[in-house]
Amino acid sequence: MERKFSDQELIRRNHLQELKDQNKNPFLATKVERSMSLKDFAEEYKNFSKEELHNMDLKKVTLAGRLIGVRQTFGIIQDFSTKLQIYIDKKNVDPEVFSTFKSLDIGDIVELQGVAMKTNSDEITLNVTNIKLVAKSLKVLPEKYHGLVDEEIKARQRYLDLIVNDESKNTFIKRSLIIREMRNWLDSQGFFEVETPVLQDILSGAAARPFITHHNTLDKQYYLRIATEIALKKCIVGGFEKVYEIGRIFRNEGMDSTHNPEFTSVELYVAYVDLWYIMQLTEDLIRHIATKLKLLNPTFRGFSVDLNKPFKKAHMVDLINEHVGVNFFEVKSDEQALELAKKHHVKLLDHQKNFGHIVNAFFETFVEEKLIEPTFVYGHPVQVSPLTKKNQEDPRFVDRFELFICQKEFANAYSEINDPIDQYERFVAQLEEAKLGNDEANELDMEFIEALEYGMPPTGGLGIGVDRLVMLLTSNDSIRNVLLFPHMKDKAK
């Protein structure tokens, strides 16, 4: 297939061919013996004056980076750590070295030898004595003053975004540090990290539509996991008392500013604890990460958040009563609930025409958007919580909470069902919902039922969407901005 190139791209390709003709193919370079990073170089010499550096017997260093700017005999290179000014004096270098410098294009990756100097403006600079091209840029970088601002291009060509936008690079550095700190904190609390299968033959662990694939050798249908829950609870049955997994989850659902079909979650399970223990653990974990990384006061979706303040706690029914004036504690039948849904114009699907789904629909319709400060919402209806232990005081509800911040859910936690008979009945109820059109209903997982029949201690479980947490802590309103390579629609032709 014939490719078309711009005039600038053709010039660069001609430069490359000239180098090859001179036996100077930059792509034959296999490594660069760098003395240090650009940041370390700047740090090492920043406290010396221009005169001191000039009079010192300095050792030559080898640096490397991408050329991102040129002005006469000055240039700017960058590596992962920082940017650095370079200078080449035509009078004091071999003519071939100077010729190499003048032939460089913006975006080229170079190896440089030289010594430290400072300019009249006191800027640390590498006084170049030798230069070698180690990778040729055949594409033109975005103009440096305006950068790369098209959000579509930034997401599709993240590598380009990372080259030219420090803000984007810093977001992904913070993402890495957030996950590292999450792992460090859990390890310090006595948790064991485990790995569970991505391919699963039973659909369970969450309410979500799956991606489906086929295992050729076994001639069997598998799902890409929609949660790690079931496998982790089997670990609790097996005797682990604190386990977690940070891993990829796949849900074949819509995409918007807070949803991507492939995302990262952390799930953890603790034996012998209840919902309230997990609630405190959740708050402690998030606050620890935010404190450690100095991210306690982010801005998210236009709201300022103070993660240093104690998180609020409220029952779902109390919140509905507060915002709508409907007290579902007093509703005694599905029929009553349906009348209330009709009165308040709450839309329901066929499988949602029961007390529990209606309570949940009221909450999602009228309350979620009011929850700005970090708030633990507990007391979900049993019909929307098939893996959660029933509340002993009112079995229409379960011991579950979700954490909401700035109108969005960030965490979901349960007191886990450990009664295999109850769990079996919940799975059967899910099958009935599937018949009514609920394509997010769980399947009957008899292998998990059998595991529970061996005995699982009272257990608290938690799931946190890592991507959404990163969005919050880095003040990003779109999930695409915190995923290195988000899923995108095909380009318009």
Curated annotation (Swiss-Prot):
Pfam families named in the record: tRNA-synt_2, tRNA_anti-codon
UniProt-annotated location(s): Cytoplasm
Domain of life: Bacteria
Cofactor note: Binds 3 Mg(2+) ions per subunit.
GO biological process: lysyl-tRNA aminoacylation
EC number: 6.1.1.6
Gene Ontology CC: one annotated term: cytosol
Residues binding Mg(2+) 1: 402, 409
CDD domains to which the protein is assigned, alphabetical: LysRS_core, LysRS_N
Protein name per its UniProtKB record: Lysine--tRNA ligase
Protein source organism: Ureaplasma urealyticum serovar 10 (strain ATCC 33699 / Western)
UniProt gene name: lysS
